């Protein structure tokens, strides 16, 4: 399984040769493409061709392209990499409303629980309240517990004056981290043959990644935890911060009772969703649980 997250921050030319990504910035570096899960091109002075994007897509690499402010503006994903794409698409279309609501219930419960765990890890007030709130989530989140939890959570985490959507450094870091997580989830969904436009809950007709937006929800608190511990007292989002946010994919979380990297956990989550859909049993879905930040060492 691919495990590397690569970020290109300085002017360079990129190419692929003999199944290696070649990075040339005066010196030449080689990385096996089969090892790469996500490539982030931060500098607008990086040169590459459509052949590069084609080769990366063939190796199921999610390529994120940033603007002059180093903010992600585009994600390039592979198409038709699964050998039973039609079967999976048919399975998506045949999902009942009741089943989709149950899947969303599970996702929302885990997201709110992880928000509570984030507060508990940081010794902030409100962790137990959110965990109890997560247990009360109904099918389809009929009582809108997600919104109730989010309003409480962000105030407890970043203070009463914090507003999600402001242009401050905390929001910039959150948005950057969420985009990386979203791209990793979208990449894995595509690898398993899912059409990311067809969401379980998100259904924006202008959004090509509704399903990725559904399944990234339990991962958001991992980004929040990192941002609180590393950004809360900073004035700007530096290159070092962005590199670490990309590297979050190699930190640990818990899924199915075992420690895994976030990348591996995403794969297990999507794999379990495939099984849950094929057997029409929402209880088979496995979702990640956060833990104190710790790098995952691959064996």
Name these PLM-found stretches.
Residues 2-5, 11-12, 26, 58, ...:
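Active-site helix-to-loop segments that bind/position phosphate- or nucleotide-bearing substrates
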Residues 8-50, 54:
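N-terminal ordered "arm"
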Residues 35-84:
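Glycine/small-residue-rich interface belts in oligomeric ring/scaffold proteins
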